[in-house]
């Protein structure tokens, strides 16, 4: 898939990022992961992010990322697979190349590890990754790697395969500046934790797709909510926010790192155990798992 085709695909519908399955020894459980990606592919995601943030990219070593990508590609059918990459520039380039070789249709460039840097340094980082591959790249603005509108415009000029911008910062005024300046030169993706609760504000800012974590365990509900957003069905949007997302977020916010842990827990509730999260994350307690099961059951009954 060439970069322009990927750009069109990403903008065509709802996105998600599968969790990465581990066995009890915390090794990649490829068989379970394949079954999960195959199941998700039946719910019309526009693209899936393999080894993304919810896929515990930060806990995978560089050799595991192409394994995850290859496993996803084997069962995803026509659904594009976008691989995570990141860390320092040399490691990000290494992962990018190996993911492309493994069959990834594109890359999501996560922030470099720990380091805060000036715009020139961030530009050099993104440019190095883009120029190392031929597939499309989406840059993820968040935490310690926040590119401004001028920097993104410059990168778009210098890197033809930079096709997307994903925002995980939440400064809607900055997002509006970027979407207004760049227009259709990029596809714009919402990337806040449980982005559904932010989606209406982002839609108004010109960001009409996002990556849904809960798609992992309630894909039909996630698509119903997204469809209501796209069609302006405010009653359905409000119903799902109040009945599912607000109590879900309250549970997610109980502990640090639960934005990932609670997604794996959701699959566990369904009887599709993805295995534990890797340290330093922690799994939900039995009491929290029961609370999540009640939230899911209530949403299904609505």
Swiss-Prot record:
Pfam families referenced in this protein's UniProt entry, alphabetically: DHDPS
Pathway assigned in UniProt: Carbohydrate acid metabolism; D-glucarate degradation; 2,5-dioxopentanoate from D-glucarate: step 2/2
SMART domains, sorted: DHDPS
Keyword Secreted: no
Enzyme class: lyase
CDD domains the record matches: KDGDH
Swiss-Prot/TrEMBL catalytic activity: 5-dehydro-4-deoxy-D-glucarate + H(+) = 2,5-dioxopentanoate + CO2 + H2O
Claim: Lyase is one of the keywords in the record: yes
Known EC number: 4.2.1.41
Keyword terms of this UniProt record: Lyase
Gene Ontology biological process terms from the UniProt entry: D-glucarate catabolic process
Cross-referenced InterPro entries: Aldolase_TIM, DapA-like, Dehydro-deoxyglucarate_dehyd
Example GO molecular function: 4-hydroxy-tetrahydrodipicolinate synthase activity
PANTHER family, per the entry: 5-DEHYDRO-4-DEOXYGLUCARATE DEHYDRATASE 2-RELATED, DIHYDRODIPICOLINATE SYNTHASE
Protein family according to the UniProt entry: Belongs to the DapA family.
The protein's name in its UniProt record: Probable 5-dehydro-4-deoxyglucarate dehydratase
Organism of origin: Rhizobium rhizogenes (strain K84 / ATCC BAA-868) (Agrobacterium radiobacter)
Lineage: Bacteria, Pseudomonadati, Pseudomonadota, Alphaproteobacteria, Hyphomicrobiales
């Amino acid at each position: 898939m060439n970069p322009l085709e990927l750009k069109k695909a990403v903008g065509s519908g709802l996105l998600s990022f599968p969790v990465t399955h581990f066995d009890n020894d915390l090794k990649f459980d490829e068989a379970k992961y394949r079954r999960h990606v195959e199941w998700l592919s039946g719910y019309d995601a526009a693209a899936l992010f393999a080894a993304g943030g919810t896929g515990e990219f930060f806990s995978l070593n560089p050799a595991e990322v192409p394994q995850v990508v290859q496993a996803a590609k084997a069962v995803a059918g026509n659904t594009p697979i976008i691989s995570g990459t990141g860390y320092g520039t040399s490691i990000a380039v290494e992962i990018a190349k190996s993911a492309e070789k493994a069959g990834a249709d594109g890359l999501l460039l996560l922030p470099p590890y720990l380091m805060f840097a000036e715009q020139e340094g961030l530009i050099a980082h993104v440019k190095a990754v883009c120029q190392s591959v031929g597939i499309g790249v989406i840059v993820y603005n968040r935490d310690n790697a926040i590119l401004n509108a001028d920097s993104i415009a410059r990168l778009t000029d210098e890197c033809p395969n930079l096709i997307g911008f994903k925002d995980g910062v939440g400064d809607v005024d900055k997002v509006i500046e970027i979407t207004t300046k760049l227009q259709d030169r990029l596809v714009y993706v919402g990337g806040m934790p449980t982005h559904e609760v932010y989606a209406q504000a982002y839609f108004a800012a010109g960001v009409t797709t996002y990556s849904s974590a809960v798609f992992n365990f309630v894909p039909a509900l996630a698509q119903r909510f997204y469809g209501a957003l796209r069609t302006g069905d405010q009653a359905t949007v409000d119903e799902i926010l109040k009945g599912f997302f607000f109590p879900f977020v309250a549970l997610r916010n109980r502990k640090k790192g639960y934005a990932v842990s609670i997604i794996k827990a959701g699959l566990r509730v369904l009887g599709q155990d993805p295995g534990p999260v890797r340290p330093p994350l922690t799994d939900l307690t039995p009491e929290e798992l029961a609370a999540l099961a009640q939230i899911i059951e209530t949403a299904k009954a609505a």
